[in-house]
């Protein structure tokens, strides 16, 4: 990964931040990703990448972006979206370095009511400094 690090360092020299979109099971390389990139996006729970377990391991080195299962955006309900958001905010937001988003993307078939619930959760819980008492 030294060549990746060199590319990111060049971007940093120009004042840029670099996000890594990386699907799948990345535990074997999570420390390298956190060392190189400013943000890690697409934290895919279905591949064993639990945002609540990632935060204490690399949350002080990189921004974590995700938490709302993209499968739930397609097949779930506003209630499942709210559960995903509550878990992500509780586990990843305290101390900063968290951006709420889908675990992948807003795929074809995403339900508008679930996207709107993401926005409601963001509006309700997503302003720093995070207040953990809001999640109950």
Question: What would you call each of these model-derived segments?
Answer:
Residues 1-136:
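Active-site loop segments of alpha/beta catalytic cores
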């Amino acid at each position: 990964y030294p060549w990746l690090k060199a590319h990111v360092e060049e971007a940093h020299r120009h004042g840029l931040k670099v996000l890594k979109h990386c699907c799948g099971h990345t535990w074997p390389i999570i420390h390298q990703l956190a060392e190189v990139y400013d943000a890690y996006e697409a934290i895919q729970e279905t591949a064993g990448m639990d945002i609540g377990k990632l935060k204490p391991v690399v949350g002080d080195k990189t921004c974590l972006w995700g938490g709302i299962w993209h499968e739930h955006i397609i097949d779930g309900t506003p209630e499942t979206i709210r559960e995903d958001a509550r878990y992500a905010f509780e586990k990843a937001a305290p101390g900063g370095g968290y951006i709420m988003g889908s675990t992948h993307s807003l795929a074809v078939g995403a339900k508008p009511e679930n996207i709107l619930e993401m926005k409601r959760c963001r509006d309700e819980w997503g302003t720093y400094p995070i207040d953990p008492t809001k999640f109950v």
